[in-house]
Amino acid sequence: DNKKQGLPVIIFTGAGCSKSAGMPLANELVAEINKKFKSNLRALTDTQKKDYGSCMGKLTPHEQKTLIEKHISKAKINWAHIALASLLKEGYIGKVLTFNFDNILNRACSLDSFYPPTYDLKVLSEEYFSAIPNQSIVHLHGQWSGFQLANSDIDTEQQAEKLKNFIKNTINNSPKLFIGYSGGADAFFELVKEN
């Protein structure tokens, strides 16, 4: 019905959507950072050493990207992304707004010769947000192949502020569904609660 009314569903995806594809959850990345980058984390408290944003904030952008890219290169397309790709292609989904850096949904779309526009809101200027068409994939915190990733607490807080109006308009104008997003690893969840 929403498709017929011109209000396709907006899907928000988090790490849980990519877990069965082989991508780690935030707490698994934190454990990996604590193991591989101990010297980077010396200034953190024990509590901070368990926090995704705090740990990522102690890595250089190159270290962050290398850590994530290693997992993306091994990730397999899963059924969740195949289903999302099919619904996106047929217009039942307006946009997929993802917190994930991976390209699994793009790869799933390509299985059906569907190549949706993909936007990286970490680097895209706010003036273009309203021009993002339906049947697109939107990376809210950047994409692994992009120039910037929102990983640290400071980065995600700044990104949440940048996305404030875009998220408000999106949430208030379309039905939405959250898949695999816990809300615990970034400042974005406050925007959802506000709207």
Where are these regions (language model features)?
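Conserved catalytic-core helix/loop/strand module for nucleotide-ribose chemistry
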Residues: 1-175, 181-195
